[in-house]
Amino acid sequence: MKLYYKPGACSLASHIALHETGCMFEIEAVDTVTGRTEKGADYHAINPKGYVPALDLNEGGVLTEGAAVLQYIADSHPAAELAPEAGTMARARMQEQLNWIGTELHKAFGPLFREGTSETGKDEARVAVAGKFDLIETQLKDGREWLVADRFTIADAYLFVVSNWANFTGIDLARWPNLAAFVSRNASRPSAKAAMRAEGLIQ
């Protein structure tokens, strides 16, 4: 199994999840601008969409889209308990979180990373992100450590990665103390440290 990733991108969530399982896997970085992998392969031949993540399942084909990759990792390694049991309300709540993070929060950051975005456009994006963070802060105010149930799930990995982008886009997480604590809690997990170290994000 091989994960194609871009350092610090949303694929980091899948990288963290793989470390949580303790399974054997490979990683290969992708330059989404040139469309080449670090080994010189044509990434579009692997994933025609051109973005990350992509999980090569060897003879099982290539799986794309972050939420799908995360759920596959969780479901194929049930002992890691990275997702509630299928068919339960807890599972539906986790999927609800994954969908919202992907379609609302993740998307809101887009202009902040897009080349050519004007300063006005970036300011508007920061306002949009702040509104999403307000919603998360409200959820976390009840004292919960994790988004779903009482343990870490793949939804936490995804929220951590996207929320952590605030630190690179001029958004001060101190405005949302519960979210800031959530990000810190996730960053301290061995899986997150291992994945970030492998991607060259930390020493």
Annotated model-derived regions:
Residues Q97, I101-S191:
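GST-like fold's C-terminal all-alpha helical module
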